[in-house]
Structure formats: structure tokens, C-alpha cells
Swiss-Prot record:
Its main location: cytoplasm. The gene is fusA. This is Elongation factor G. GO terms for cellular component: cytoplasm. Keywords: Cytoplasm, Elongation factor, GTP-binding, Nucleotide-binding, Protein biosynthesis. It comes from Rhodopseudomonas palustris (strain BisA53).
Length: 690
């Protein structure tokens, strides 16, 4: 079956925002007006079509990015709903990888919020073209112009209004389209489906002219001919203006800002028009680069004729179909029934069922083309970030990098049956989410879950209980401490064992020194003249690595250490790889003692937004948690406090902050760095773990 929509008519975009800015509601309205859902789902009723996991509907936040296809003005929209809670930044990063553009939704009462900054920075990292939608214009305190100022102050970006609101709060009627110089007004009765163009109200005409002039000045800077004509007194025509705004979006020269109220059904259709007019198609963004089998860089263009390449960006467990892998096809054509190679893992896969997803309904398809986002059922080996490609023309597309988890909990199944279910469930959850890790504590035999924050792990435990029906006891959350040495140490160690027959003999000499923060573990053999034969070096490494997972301070993983093997001795008969492994293990433990190992704790970057009345209490409380206040500023009538606080002092903080501020203060936190723990903390941790 030939391609139905030209690739130029595709818009793969996501909706990114701070929690509660109205992202899911905006997506809902888009699906409603594009005719994909017949009843509008409300988040606060727990019925939104995109939020289809039970946990999301209860908590009213979006956890998984569901991908949905819809149509508008003959263009095909693939919408990826991204979560806006800081514990799920991994999902946002992952969806930004496969988008070509994004709509950044702001709450016009709040302006740019902490999480908006986080997702905006991620957007910058992946160079995602963006337009901005100032939502919730009907809310008390909504201020469109403050949003524009916030984008300059807080995001360091250049906003250009291409619409202005007519009225605000309860009187929000519609908007002025500055490109066409028309007012657009909605009738309340038709759920926002009916709207009409009218003349701009007299009292807003001057303001509209002023902002249209600003918009045109920003646009003509991108085109010499248009600039020359404008300086001669000729304004660009509508088509030229749209072309220039599109160019600005693609190059990041400025960001068009629109306004509306998704909840009140106003402004969504013009937002869809802007998505079509200004966001890129797959051919407008740089072609994706990858590495071929020989390690050379290759490019895959968004073209059906190019060799097949697709990236798995999300894995979900579906109760009806089994494992579903969401993939973005970058080049070529994918047909069900064909064989592909998972080049990341060097495994073959067969393409079975191919589905186009609407939030919770699915449509079977036989073929998919460059630019498509499809869900593949039944892939065996694929993990998030893997490349699938043509077996004859293999390529590995850019790898995704995932942050290290900073918080862990122990989980104990209540019965043998639960134990079995738990194993299966955890394997699936870890495949779906690379920022969630599972390991077994060798000493206690407990299963340890590691994640990005309390909410992240709460939701995983919730999924285990509901979806997989696992009954388990959950331990208190633990901090993922680390250990590192603080000074250079030299050790000489000989392992000798004589018990009749063949003995064991190995001698090693190490220099162990601190590596720079984030440098990880590095091993180097400086052996010359065969003092330690080559075949024993892997044994030496194995010995060191066996100690890395459990240091000498309190048994936590050792990081940022450089080990050089400088000398050694061996015996023709009694030496073996095992003997060198034993010697290296003992030598390295001794070096960690000599090198004055210290405990490192994760430090979180915390931002609290609080009404001024509670500022003193919030700062006092952060100080009592060993927090270091980095600064504060005003945002509207709220005070924003930035602090660095050790994670171990942040457990249960959300409840404390709520009771301290009568529920009015909010906070976000994300991992920032590891720092040496003070002596009293280190002693406390040693007492507990060592």
C-alpha cells in the first residue's frame, strides 16, 4: 500500500510543560477537535484519554508518554504526551529524542515554573524547535505579558507574541491573531468547536498594532528582501510572514507565543494551525546520524528509499497485546512479517503486529514509512534506546544517556507465589524504564529497587500491586551513598598459600589515586618486562572490580578511582588468574583504607516556591536539613528559594512543606552532585550499614 500522507505533511511533536500547566487537557482538546475522541476527558474527573494508566488517572499527572496519531488541515499529527513531573524527566528526554518539534505549555497565572525550565533545557539539549502556548488564560491572576517577560528572564529565550488575549480571567473571550490582524471569538455553547473571526475591539487596536510591529520586526530580520521592503514601508504579506516565523522556529531565532484556555475550549484550533504552520516536518530537521558496522559515522535521511532505521523510545506492557515497543522510523519502510536486526544488541527480530496508537485504541497496519511513530507488538530483545535496522545496511543511531538513580527501597514478597510474580514484573518494569534499576543485596538477599525520587518508586510499587497483583512489604527508602578515596596510596601485596601439591602465589603492586569527580573507575597496567604475564591481567581487574561494589567505609560502591598496576611477581607453577584475583582484591581493599576513603552523599537541587508569609519557616526548615540556600527571588507574589540539600534529609519533605505552608508552597528537586558527607553523618551511616 503506497504512502497516504507525504512526509512533508507530518508533524511529530510533543507537549511539554510543568506539572499542572494543563498539558494533558491541551492534548485532550487537540484529540477532540481533530475528531479522534468523541467525548472530552477531564483530568480532574480522572477520564483523560491520554492518561491511561490507573495510577495517572488517580494522581492526575501524566506518567507515560502515550503516542497518538490525529489529523488537522490535511496534515498528519503524531502527538507524544510527555510527563511534567521531575521524577519522570527521563521520559521527557526520551520523547524529545524522537520529536521534531514541541509545544511548551505555560500556566499564565504562574508563568515559567521550575519544571518548565528543566524541560526547556532538555529541549535546548536536543535542539527541538518550539512554540509556546500560554494556557489557563481564564484563571484568576492570568497574565499573558508576564509570561513573555518570564521567557526572557527565566529561560533566556526570545519570545514573540503572535496572538494577544481579549480579556483575561472570567472575561477571557478569545484572542487577536496578529498575523491576520483579526479577532477570534468562541461561542461557549458549542464546547469551543464554533468560533468566528471579527474585527479587533477598538480598545485593543493600539496594543495589537504595537505587538504586530514587534512581531514583524523580529521576523524580517531573517530575510534581507523582506527587511528591505519593510524599511521602505511595505509590510510582508501573510504567506511571507508565516514563512519567516516558521524559519525562526526551525532555527531557534525566536519562539512564537500563543494564548488560550484549553479547559474552557478557547484557542486550541489556532494552536493546531500554528503546529501545522510553524513546527517542522521530518525533512525540516537535520538528518539523524549513526555509526555503521565499521564504526564510521553515517547519516539516515527521512526518506522511504533510504535503508530502514528506527529507534525504540518507549516500551510498555499492554494487558491485551503483551509487550509494545514504540518506535520512530527515521528512514526506509517497515513491513510486518519482515526481519530486522537490533544493531545495539546484535540480535535478530521479526516484525509481527504493527499498530498505530490512539491514546487507548489501536489500529493494525501492515506498513509504516519514514517519519511514522508506530507501536510494535512482541519484540523479544528490544530495550529503550535500541536501534532496529535493515540487516544488510546496519546502523546504530545515537545512544540515549540515562541518569543514575539516587534513591532505593528494599522490597520483600509476602509469599512464594508473590516471589515468582515479582521477578517477572520487575524484569518488565526495568525494560520499560531505564532510570529504574533492580538489584539484589548479596548479604541480605533482599531485592532492591532504585529510582529517581520518592514519587518514581511509589508509582512503581503501585504498578506492582495493581497491574501485577504482587503483595509485598516495602522498606523505608535508602539513599544511594558512594565512597571514594581522598589521597594517593601505594600498596604491595603478596598472596601465598601452600597446602601440599600445587600452591597459590601472586604478588601485585598498585598505585591508587582519586580520579576527578564523574571520572569513574579507570584501570591501567604499567607492567613492562612481563613481571605479571598478560594472561593474568584480567584476573587482576576482576579482583579490583569485585571490591568496587562494596567499599571499606560502609560497604557502598566506590567511585572515581584510578588504579595503576606498576609491578608484581609470579611463580611458574603456583600462579594462576585466580591467585592474582585474590591478591588484587586484598591489595585494593588495603589501598582504600590507606587512601583515606570517605563517604559521599547525593546532594539535590531543591527549588521551593512559597507565598511570602512562609518564607522564614521554609528557609529555617531547609537549614535544619543541612541545606545551603543558593539564593531567592520573587516570582509574581511568591518567593522562590533555591537550595542544595542532602537527599537523606529530604525524605517526607513534601508533607512537611504542605503543613508548614497550609498546602500553598510547592517544591521540585533533582539530583545535582555527590559531595563528601560530614563526619557525624558518616559515623551514623557506618553504624547503620558497616
Amino acid at each position: 500500500m503506497p504512502r497516504v500522507h507525504a512526509i512533508e505533511d507530518y508533524r511529530n511533536f510533543g507537549i511539554m510543560a510543568h506539572i499542572d500547566a494543563g498539558k494533558t487537557t491541551t492534548t485532550e482538546r487537540i484529540l477532540y477537535y481533530t475528531g479522534k475522541s468523541h467525548k472530552i476527558g477531564e483530568v480532574h474527573e480522572g477520564a483523560a484519554t491520554m492518561d491511561w494508566m490507573e495510577q495517572e488517572q488517580e494522581r492526575g499527572i501524566t506518567i507515560t508518554s502515550a503516542a497518538t496519531t490525529a489529523f488537522w488541515n490535511g496534515k498528519r499529527l503524531n502527538i507524544i504526551d510527555t510527563p511534567g513531573h521531575v521524577d519522570f524527566t527521563i521520559e521527557v528526554e526520551r520523547s524529545l529524542r524522537v520529536l521534531d518539534g514541541a509545544v511548551c505549555v505555560l500556566d499564565s497565572n504562574q508563568g515559567v515554573e521550575p519544571q518548565t525550565e528543566t524541560v526547556w533545557r532538555q529541549g535546548d539539549k536536543y535542539r527541538v524547535p518550539r512554540i509556546v502556548f500560554a494556557n489557563k488564560m481564564d484563571k484568576t491572576g492570568a497574565d499573558f505579558f508576564k509570561c513573555l517577560q518570564d521567557i526572557i528572564d527565566r529561560l533566556g529565550a526570545k519570545p514573540v507574541a503572535i496572538q494577544l488575549p481579549i480579556g483575561s480571567e472570567n472575561n477571557f473571550k478569545g484572542l487577536i491573531d496578529l498575523v491576520r490582524m483579526k479577532a477570534v471569538v468562541w461561542s461557549d455553547e458549542s464546547l469551543g468547536a464554533k468560533f468566528e473571526d471579527t474585527e479587533i475591539p477598538e480598545d485593543l487596536l493600539e496594543q495589537a498594532k504595537e505587538y504586530r510591529e514587534k512581531m514583524i520586526e523580529a521576523a524580517v530580520e531573517l530575510d534581507d528582501d523582506a527587511m528591505a521592503a519593510y524599511l521602505d514601508g511595505t509590510e510582508p504579506e501573510e504567506a511571507v510572514l508565516k514563512r519567516l516565523i516558521r524559519k525562526a522556529v526551525l532555527t531557534g531565532a525566536f519562539y512564537p507565543v500563543l494564548c488560550g484556555s484549553a479547559f474552557k475550549n478557547k484557542g486550541v484550533q489556532p494552536l493546531l494551525d500554528a503546529v501545522v504552520d510553524y513546527l517542522p516536518s521530518p525533512v525540516d530537521v537535520p538528518a539523524i546520524k549513526g555509526i555503521d558496522e565499521d564504526g564510521n559515522e553515517v547519516t539516515r535521511h527521512a526518506d522511504d528509499k533510504e535503508p530502514l532505521s528506527l529507534l525504540a523510545f518507549k516500551i510498555m506492557d499492554d494487558p491485551f497485546v503483551g509487550t509494545i515497543t514504540f518506535c520512530r522510523i527515521y528512514s526506509g519502510v517497515l513491513q510486518s512479517g519482515t526481519g530486522v536486526v537490533n544493531s545495539t544488541r546484535e540480535k535478530k527480530e521479526r516484525i509481527g503486529r504493527m499498530l498505530l496508537m490512539h491514546a487507548n485504541n489501536r489500529e493494525d497496519i501492515k506498513e509504516a514509512y519514514a517519519g511514522d511513530i508506530v507501536a510494535l507488538a512482541g519484540l523479544k530483545e528490544a530495550r529503550t534506546g535500541d536501534t532496529l535496522c535493515d540487516p544488510q545496511k546496519q546502523v546504530i543511531l545515537e545512544k540515549m544517556e540515562f541518569p543514575e538513580p539516587v534513591i532505593e527501597i528494599a522490597i520483600e514478597p509476602k509469599s512464594k507465589a508473590d516471589q515468582e510474580k515479582l521477578g517477572v514484573a520487575l524484569a518488565k518494569l526495568a525494560a520499560e524504564d531505564p532510570s529504574f534499576r533492580v538489584s539484589t543485596d548479596l548479604e541480605s538477599g533482599q531485592t532492591i529497587l532504585k529510582g529517581m525520587g520518592e514519587l518514581h518508586l511509589d508509582i512503581k510499587v503501585d504498578i506492582l500491586r495493581r497491574t501485577y497483583k504482587v503483595d509485598a512489604n516495602i522498606g523505608a527508602p535508602q539513599v544511594a551513598f558512594r565512597e571514594r578515596i581522598t589521597k594517593r596510596a601505594e600498596v604491595d601485596y603478596t598472596h601465598k598459600k601452600q597446602t601440599g601439591g600445587t600452591g597459590q602465589f601472586a604478588a601485585v603492586k598498585f598505585i591508587v589515586e582519586p580520579n576527578e569527580p564523574g571520572g569513574g573507575y579507570v584501570f591501567e597496567s604499567k607492567i613492562v618486562g612481563g613481571a605479571v604475564p598478560k594472561e593474568y591481567i584480567p584476573g587482576v581487574e576482576k579482583g579490583i572490580e569485585s571490591v568496587l561494589s562494596s567499599g571499606v567505609v560502609a560497604g557502598f560502591p566506590v567511585v572515581d578511582v584510578k588504579v595503576s598496576l606498576i609491578d608484581g611477581k609470579y611463580h611458574d607453577v603456583d600462579s594462576s588468574a585466580l591467585a592474582f584475583e585474590i591478591a588484587s582484591r586484598a591489595a585494593f581493599r588495603e589501598a582504600l583504607q590507606k587512601g583515606k576513603s570517605v563517604l559521599l552523599e547525593p546532594i539535590m537541587k531543591v527549588e521551593c516556591v512559597t507565598p511570602e508569609d512562609y518564607t522564614g519557616s521554609v528557609i529555617g526548615d531547609l537549614n535544619s536539613r543541612r541545606g545551603q540556600i543558593q539564593g531567592q527571588d520573587m516570582r509574581g507574589n511568591a518567593n522562590v528559594i533555591n537550595a542544595m540539600v542532602p537527599l537523606m534529609n529530604m525524605f517526607g519533605y513534601v508533607n512537611n512543606l504542605r503543613s508548614m505552608s497550609q498546602g500553598r508552597a510547592t517544591f521540585t528537586m533533582q539530583f545535582d552532585h555527590y559531595a563528601e558527607a560530614p563526619a557525624n553523618v558518616s559515623a551514623e551511616v557506618q553504624k547503620k550499614f558497616a
